[in-house]
């Protein structure tokens, strides 16, 4: 089983990691993207990414100083511990023990505009490059064309190695799209979380993001590897709804 997550814009490098580390699979492709971004002035970055002048300058500096990370340093640390934001508030990777992190390293994958795909312990430098960015490269007019089928093949090979067909989608549409059209024999499961508000159960964006992280945390802590066990998810008062669920979309409801 593989679980895919989106990354986060908020990063935190102010921590010490006692975990092992690994190296991203597509560093040569990341370097090509950085070489492209290094040619752009802050005003170009601001326009391309819709950033303030301050954020554009910060990321200009990041691109200029970027190099492939192969050892831990002040600005090179394991990806799942660096990412903050709603999903990672739910995940709370800093609380995972070594056994849980080992499970996460095998089963969790973070989709990334710059790195393509990251394992939890893959070393990552600070960056900003969302998957939906219309960055033109020699491969095409956006990052989906740049990555092509590389990320999909990586995930399919991981599933093959695990003798599994189960892909848990806890990523946003923007990021999951990089996986392209998956083979029909891959069982894609997309958990959905709804909260009771104004007389109805509905998806609330902030909670939905945090809940994806909660689901990932629960899977890691319980070392879940099959679809049937997902219905047991019960963190933060969520309960599985058989009535609202389908074969590929398990629905979890929470009443305040």
Residues covered by each model-derived region:
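Active-site helix-to-loop segments that bind/position phosphate- or nucleotide-bearing substrates
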Residues: 4-95
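Internal, well-folded beta-alpha domain core
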Residues: 93-246, 251-256
């Amino acid at each position: 089983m593989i679980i895919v997550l989106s990354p986060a814009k908020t990063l935190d490098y102010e921590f010490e990691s006692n975990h092992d580390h690994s190296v991203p699979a597509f560093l040569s492709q990341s370097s090509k993207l950085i070489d492209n971004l290094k040619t752009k002035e802050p005003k170009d970055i601001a326009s391309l990414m819709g950033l303030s002048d301050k954020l554009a300058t910060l990321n200009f500096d990041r691109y200029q100083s970027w190099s492939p990370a192969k050892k831990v340093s002040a600005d090179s640390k394991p990806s799942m511990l660096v990412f903050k934001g709603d999903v990672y508030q739910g995940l709370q990777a800093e609380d995972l023990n070594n056994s849980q992190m080992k499970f996460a390293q095998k089963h969790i994958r973070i989709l990334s505009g710059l790195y393509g795909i990251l394992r939890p312990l893959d070393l990552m430098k600070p960056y900003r490059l969302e998957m939906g960015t219309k960055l033109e490269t020699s491969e095409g007019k956006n990052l989906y064309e740049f990555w092509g089928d590389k990320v999909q093949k990586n995930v399919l090979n991981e599933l093959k190695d695990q003798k599994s067909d189960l892909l848990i989608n806890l990523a946003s549409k923007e990021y999951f799209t990089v996986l392209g059209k998956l083979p029909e024999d891959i069982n894609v499961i997309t958990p959905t979380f709804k909260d009771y508000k104004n007389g109805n159960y509905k998806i609330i964006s902030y909670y939905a993001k945090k809940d994806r992280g909660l689901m990932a945390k629960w899977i890691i802590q319980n070392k879940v590897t099959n679809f049937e066990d997902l219905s047991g998810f019960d963190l933060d008062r969520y309960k599985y709804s058989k009535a609202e669920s389908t074969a590929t979309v398990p629905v979890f409801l929470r009443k305040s």
